[in-house]
């Protein structure tokens, strides 16, 4: 692997300066000597004190040093590299107002994260006027439009590696004057299949570029990127208790495959979990199967997967953070497809790193490979990552806010993925809950319609999860349901599952895509001009692909658990559709029309008996 040369053509040294930090310095944004326009933007965004990663990274970045920072999502790492880059751009523009050149490049693994970074740049450069221009290359626009956007030499570009290489190939983008390179979620960039793009980019970037590598974990992929792009980087390892799952209550439920649906129904219908919930499932079909299943009981939810247009995915996350939706069903496709993409060499390197990490007491994952049952087991075929799934990711990078619970409907295949999933809750010092469904080995495959392949290894994966969490000082507790009371709802679950056929799932997928395409493409410009009308768009509507059974939305009193009544009072339940919204519409319309005299036959007209007036035709 080619190592990056500095401005004097000297290879980077292997020894890097490490900055072990335990507590953030008592610094504020005033002491960082930022441009007044940036400080004004910080005040407007209510940034009062730098986070640990910001207080350490920003001064080093302003000194021109390369930085490799281990920082979790939500720690403020985006501002940690955006502010120094904007500061440098403003200084250059002050010295030469006519300067037009692309000096900053931010690489991210997914479109959702690109949009998130772009929004942060826009907020921080709000008072910079035309001195700072940024472009998001992941937007779904034509090549001609993208070429026009790049023709004006924007100062800062946010993109996935694939889009950068595509524009370099057409000469629409020039990196000749690049001075800053950021790779956000660096450990994901290679695992998402951007290996060739990264290698090509390493050859295209000029020497002496200041590099920021931001990652939630320090893995072999990050070491590869460090060798390609960094020059003696300063390594920041910020010890953050929140990063290790503090404040998250972790529970596990052992259940059969069809009981996952039963327990999910009971949890949401009886409101055993209150607040916003993210449900992780294994693939797109599982998304719609669960959504259609919940629709039978009047439980609304949103779907997030790689098939939906990027604008719809971003809007769903934004509305979820605002509290418009309470339940998101997310397909963690990359966790399933990307788990077998590492080569034998990288696996050996990872195993070696893990041994060292265990000795150091590191919290990194012990193995990144899914559990295989037996030595003689044939390796499963590597699933080809589609173009849509390549730049989609939901368990990492996206900053979900105020999530009360993460529900692992399908258990992830590695303890590393589990850690990233549960990290969506318990943020900013708040309490959170993680509930995982585990299928015992003797229950796997007994209910074919609801079976999922990865559930075969649930018990072995759970053992690794428990072991890792124990090292971190956390306990994964069993969550017990009183199955005698839960079984009273089983016949309803069976009726609902029977209605969610494979054909219904296919129709739901197609209908959802059609609806979201209309919202995303045709109305995009209209909503930019009329932002208030965008609030009327909802993504949790009923797909109505499955057979509707209105009686399932109502829970009779005799089904309500006797012990649970005290905890679920009528005041606490909130609105539940106990009555059908469209009940007896035709009958009500008839009664209303009778009062107006409509539909009545004129008085005096005798009723004709058809049996008396029937004439047999002659032969």
Swiss-Prot record:
Cleavable signal peptide: none
Name of one Pfam family that matches: Helicase_C
Domain Helicase C-terminal: 247-484
Keywords for the protein's UniProt record, in alphabetical order: ATP-binding, Helicase, Hydrolase, Nucleotide-binding, Nucleus, Ribosome biogenesis, RNA-binding, rRNA processing
GO molecular function, a single term: RNA helicase activity
GO CC annotation, single: nucleolus
Region listing for Disordered, in residue ranges: 1-30, 339-390, 582-619
Record-annotated Helicase ATP-binding domain positions: 58-236
Record motif Q motif, residues: 27-55
Motif, DEAD box: chain positions: 184-187
Gene Ontology annotations of biological process type: maturation of LSU-rRNA from tricistronic rRNA transcript (SSU-rRNA, 5.8S rRNA, LSU-rRNA)
SMART domains, per the entry: DEXDc, HELICc
Catalysis performed (reactions): ATP + H2O = ADP + phosphate + H(+)
Family matches, as SUPFAM superfamilies: P-loop containing nucleoside triphosphate hydrolases
Name of protein: ATP-dependent RNA helicase dbp9
Species: Neosartorya fischeri (strain ATCC 1020 / DSM 3700 / CBS 544.65 / FGSC A1164 / JCM 1740 / NRRL 181 / WB 181)
Gene (UniProt): dbp9
